[in-house]
Structure formats: structure tokens, C-alpha cells
Amino acid sequence: MKILIFGLPGSGKTTLARPFAKLINGIHINGDDVRQRYCDWDFTLTGRYNQMRRMSHVADGVVFAGKTAIVDFVCPTNKFRELFNADYTVYMDTIDKSRYKDTNEMFEKPHSCDYHVSEWFGDTHKQLSKVLKHFIAKREEKHNDYPWMDALKDS
């Protein structure tokens, strides 16, 4: 499974992603860490598109290895989010503007997301609990769409 946590810089993406990954025994992939490691693209739309492709490729490798990838980065446009093709998305909508003018101008509010964090309580555990409850409910809902999966458990 590929989970995308996105939003403006400073919105709490990494603060949520790190403990979320630990709780579900997933692999956390942070956009800043990946960008810093390679440092080969700028922050233009093209550079951000290339970063999104790289993040998606790394996450796909984690999923292929049988783990859950929890990816956090800005992912500024609806098209990028669509191309990233996450199984579950969390939109961190906790700030109106970041300190980066170009990112503010480029960032598009999402057409859709699985979970929308509109305020940060200052309590990571409380916020994480809300996201996790929704995530589990969503997975159970998807599981109910495939009743044949129960038969696999019994074999």
C-alpha cells in the first residue's frame, strides 16, 4: 500500500508521517530527505514533477517488497497527486501559507483526499489517532468490497 501525506511546507506532514509509519510498521519516505540526498532538481514545476516521479518510484519499490510506504512531500498539483497514484491520501491543510512564495502560488487545493487534517491540535498522538481510525475504517470498507478475501484467510 502506498500512502501519501501532502500539504504546504510546515503543515505537519513529517510530524504525522513518522509516528504513523511506526504504528503500522511501514517505511517512511520523506521528500526533503530524498531531495537532499540527490540534490539534482530545482523547485520549478518540472523539478517538482521529477521529484514526484522519484518519490513514486521509491514508494513502488517499498510496496513491491511487501511493505507499506508512507510518503510525505508537498506534491503541489492535483495532476501530480493523480500520477503518484496513492492508495490512501492525507491532506495537511493546517496553514494558509508557507514561507515559500513560489510553493504557495503553485500549490492547488486537492479535488479529493481520503482524510483532511484542517487543524493541528499540537497533540501529535491525538491527531495520529484520528487519522489511524479513519485509515483502518477505510481499509475495512475496501476489504468488504472483496468478500472472497475471507476465504483466503481460512486456507
Predicted features and spans:
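Walker A (P-loop) ATP-phosphate-binding motif of ABC ATPase nucleotide-binding domains
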Residues: 2
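Hydrophobic anchor at the beta1->P-loop junction of P-loop NTPases
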Residues: 5
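Conserved lysine of the Walker
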Residues: 13
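Short, structured coil segments at secondary-structure junctions
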Residues: 24, 85-87, 112
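Glycine-rich phosphate-binding loop used to anchor ATP phosphates in small-molecule kinases
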Residues: 46-97
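Small-molecule kinase domains that catalyze NTP-dependent phosphoryl transfer to phosphate-bearing small molecules
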Residues: 83, 92-155
